[in-house]
């Protein structure tokens, strides 16, 4: 580590930052209204020009914040000369804390760096370097949690934090995630981040709580363009309790979902699980005949019914459900032959021949 008397050292830069903050203390803006997600670029922030100032100190004509923004967001080509990973490996814990303090000193500043692909990657590298660094980054994530979770590159920082943070930091992050899970699930970037967290969360209590929130709102999420991916993912986890809860939430709505592309994927997932197959098949058997025929001839519904037949035929414990479904469909055999339901007609004919 360079001596503090060196005007080009990191310590000198951090001391300069402290002097600047004493003269012009930063006052964080108030948090956004609860539930409001604003994805616009923070006012007053734009990436600085890519050309480096020739002065080796790096901040003669820049504030410490500008210097740090440029360091965090520079391109991979610019980083190759002196990689960020190597740079932070030579810093003391005090200097690392100083960097983290600068990066998190203003919520808009932190978010602007996190929205940059390279900035996001370098913030992720800082996570886990020390408990003090983690506390500062965790606090910054929590302060703008919805903004972070519903933006592509910032959400990677939060996901990394959930994997690495321990103790109260992880608990605070989990509690905020559970509190905002449904808003996040309905966002195109948020649903991806939420799925990652559902997979990675290694705290049984919070994981079950999060899955319960998702399962309880499975119906509304299943009809949402982004939320349906969260329900599909929750079912892929093969957690019996969650599968049962999702099935209970969707009971009576499986046929409606089966008419839609992504909804049919969810219903097919339910057919795969012992805990939920009966819920789907009973709804098919008890449905109005005309409605069942329309489903069997529909673009996506025919796959659901064909799968229901295959699944119940193979499972001895479901033989009664299989027989009931075949009897329900057999009167429509003629109508199914020359339609999207021809696969169902072929199956029924093979059963009748046997």
Q: Residue ranges of each PLM-predicted region?
A:
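Eukaryotic gene-expression regulator signature that favors modular helical reader/repeat domains
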Residues: 1-354
């Amino acid at each position: 580590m360079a001596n503090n008397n060196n005007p080009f050292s990191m310590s000198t830069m951090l001391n300069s930052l402290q002097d600047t903050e004493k003269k012009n203390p930063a006052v964080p803006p108030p948090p956004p209204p609860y539930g409001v997600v604003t994805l616009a670029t923070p006012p007053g922030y734009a990436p600085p020009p890519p050309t480096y100032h020739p002065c080796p100190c790096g901040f003669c004509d820049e504030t410490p914040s500008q210097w740090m923004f440029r360091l965090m967001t520079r391109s991979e080509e610019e980083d190759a000369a002196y990689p960020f990973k190597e740079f932070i490996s030579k810093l003391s814990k005090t200097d690392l804390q100083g960097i983290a303090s600068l990066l998190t000193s203003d919520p808009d500043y932190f978010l602007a760096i996190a929205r940059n692909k390279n900035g996001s990657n370098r913030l992720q590298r800082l996570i886990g370097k020390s408990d003090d660094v983690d506390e500062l980054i965790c606090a910054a994530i929590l302060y703008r949690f919805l903004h972070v979770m519903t933006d592509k590159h910032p959400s990677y920082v939060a996901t990394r934090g959930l994997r690495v943070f321990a103790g109260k930091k992880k608990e605070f992050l989990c509690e905020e995630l559970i509190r905002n899970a449904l808003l996040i699930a309905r966002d195109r970037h948020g649903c991806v981040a939420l799925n990652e967290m559902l997979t990675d969360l290694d705290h049984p209590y919070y994981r079950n709580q999060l899955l319960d929130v998702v399962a309880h709102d499975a119906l509304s999420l299943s009809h949402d363009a982004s939320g349906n991916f969260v329900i599909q993912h929750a079912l892929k986890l093969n957690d019996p309790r969650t599968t049962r809860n999702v099935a209970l939430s969707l009971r009576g709505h499986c046929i409606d979902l089966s008419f839609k592309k992504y909804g049919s994927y969810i219903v097919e997932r339910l057919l795969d699980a012992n805990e939920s197959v009966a819920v789907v098949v009973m709804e098919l058997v008890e449905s109005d005949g005309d409605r069942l025929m329309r489903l069997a001839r529909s673009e996506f519904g025919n796959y659901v019914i064909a799968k229901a037949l295959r699944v119940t035929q193979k499972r001895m414990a479901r033989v009664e459900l299989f027989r009931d479904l075949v009897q329900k469909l057999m009167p429509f055999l003629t109508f199914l032959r020359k339609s999207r339901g021809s696969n169902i007609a072929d199956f029924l004919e093979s059963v009748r021949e046997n």
